[in-house]
Amino acid sequence: VVNVGHVGVGGNNPIRVQSMTTTDTEDVAATLAQCIKLAEAGCEIIRITAPNKAAAAALKKIHQEFRAAGFSQPLVADIHFLPQAAMEAIEHVEKVRINPGNYADKKKFAVREYTDSAYAEELDRLHEAFTPLVLRAKALGRALRIGTNHGSLSDRIMNRYGDTPLGMVESALEFVRIAESHGFKDLVLSMKSSNPKVMIEAYRLAAARMAESAMDYPLHLGVTEAGEGEDARIKSAIGIGSLLADGLGDTIRVSLTEDPWHEIPVCRELVARADRLAENGKNSSTHYSRDPADSFSYSRRPSTLVQFSNKCRAGSNELVRVVVRSTIGLKDWQAAAKEVLDAHNQQREARVEGLLVDLPSTESIKDLLSLRKALGQTVPALFVQTTIPLSDFPFIGEGSKIVVVKSFSAGDDIELKNWAHTCAKNQAILAADVEVVAATALAKTLATLPPENLIISTQKPTAGLHAIGTYREIIRILNESKIDAPV
């Protein structure tokens, strides 16, 4: 736990919500007004930029007047480039954030090979530049955030590690080790990037590296320059939400190019969802010892190719195919076909590759055959979710490739085998919808089925598991049973 003023960060404390003022810090009245409005909106930690020593000095009056107005939220100074500004700011606010990429380094974009001794000399220089701030923070009881930015890594880091998540992590850990050498541990780390995929990998790697080194510093999560409107909220939700779902993150900020108080409701929603996930996890009786996903490298799961059409295949290194559910269905097959064709005309680059419809009874078979013929080769695959008996299913007709979506439970081995072989015989594909328990029980049978006519899916998350966790567990079962059907 790191105390930022009276606000505890990390440990069993709630996930804290942060934001940042957008005013000129030297305009004390305007900055104070934003701090007050943020506090009233529910912001728990407020960050203020201090680009120079004059701005850092202005923090004294801002802090005094903020407290005089009756607000207790801690203030944080955001420092780039100038150690002198950091030394001034630490006197007035509860926390100082520094960027290890530019705190003691000027960006020269120089290409240089560092020998081990030359690199060690650079670290000695860092130690000398950062130590005064660490010692003053320790003396005053302040906290520091080591905040790496993907876009501002130092030349030293770039030349040794490249423009990578590993470089981001190592950049922060260099400063952490300096702080620890002085017995200072009131640190928070962040690994921000404008690319959610980069920041997700960097935070996961930071957590893994800290675990290896017996470190447990809190993490502040954020996507830099997310933008505005719905796109910015989605971008932040992808980055921050993915990490919160991993159990990572102690404070968050959703960075919007809007008035800063608009960030708070978005943060609150993300925190609420993370809290619900955490509560579900505590109450779940389903626990798995190891996550099969590799957090630090991306590779596609090898799988057998499934042919929807001459130009559309699924599995292995093919593009991930997108299946959409018809909003109309078989009750009006002509309108359902028109809906797809109109979508193709409006968005020629975004074609429907698979259309999902329900076939609840034999009464709709004629409509299914008509829809299939109407779609022809326009839609490569027609996914048909059904509960009708195998003997009644209409494999006849022409048009889109038929993919039968059928649920199977533990003990349905014979039915599964019959459906799979009948689909293969009729040039159709079976999409077996199974839960984790069923996948375990049916694994031996699944391993005997023709993989080129088989897809594995699940539409119902296992109790106590998020949908992602359910799919990962099913894939683990498939891999252990050497079943390479696409998922």
Residue ranges of each PLM-predicted region?
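Catalytic alpha/beta core domains of metabolic enzymes, predominantly
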Residues: 114-130, 135, 155-309, 397-400, ...
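Active-site beta->alpha loop and helix N-cap motifs at the rims of alpha/beta catalytic domains
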Residues: 28, 43-174, 306, 312, ...
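Structured loop/turn residues at secondary-structure junctions
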Residues: 22-23, 51, 81, 194, ...
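Short, glycine-rich nucleotide/cofactor-binding loops
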Residues: 22-24, 227, 231, 327-329, ...
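N-terminal glycine-rich anion-binding loops that anchor highly charged ligand groups
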Residues: 3-18, 23-42, 46, 52-54, ...
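Conserved, mostly hydrophobic/aromatic
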Residues: 17, 78, 146, 189, ...
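N-terminal amphipathic alpha-helix/helix-capping segment at the start of soluble metabolic enzymes
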Residues: 1-19, 134-140, 276-334
